[in-house]
Amino acid sequence: MTEGGARGPAGPRGDTAAPAGRSSSLAPQADTLFAYGTLQFGPVLEELLGRVPEADLGVARDRRVAALPKRAYPGLVAEPGRMACGLVLQGLTPADWEIIDAFEDEQYELRSVRVMGWEEPVPTFVWTDVVAERDWHPEEFAADHLHGYTALCARWRAEFGRRTR
């Protein structure tokens, strides 16, 4: 989704780019987000947003969910012929976007991508730095990192709340 990094827990063609650094014009206008990484997990969303938004399955063509060096979370990159599976989170509020935007690592850029079954492009965070050759797998993340990552999210969210009061 997001997918949470240096500012959050650390452990393409055809896209509509939005400037990194954020609160871009894409986010306030959208109530959806294509989440392909850690933001697919209810416990992570619960810690960050205080709720789990409604979601539908989503697939972005010509994209790959890549593992990132020395990180538990992934990055979405362009790769012809591949398909990236995730969730389209729905009903996001401006307050949700503020949290998600602050949470995401600076190497992500908010862009709109085509998601199968969705008429309009859906915002997502694409990775702009080096990726591993291997794919990121949510089931591996769930087994190996979810518990600790969720605890990091809780600490990050508490600190974010103190900074934004």
Where are these regions (language model features)?
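Glycine-aromatic micro-motifs
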Residues: 2-165
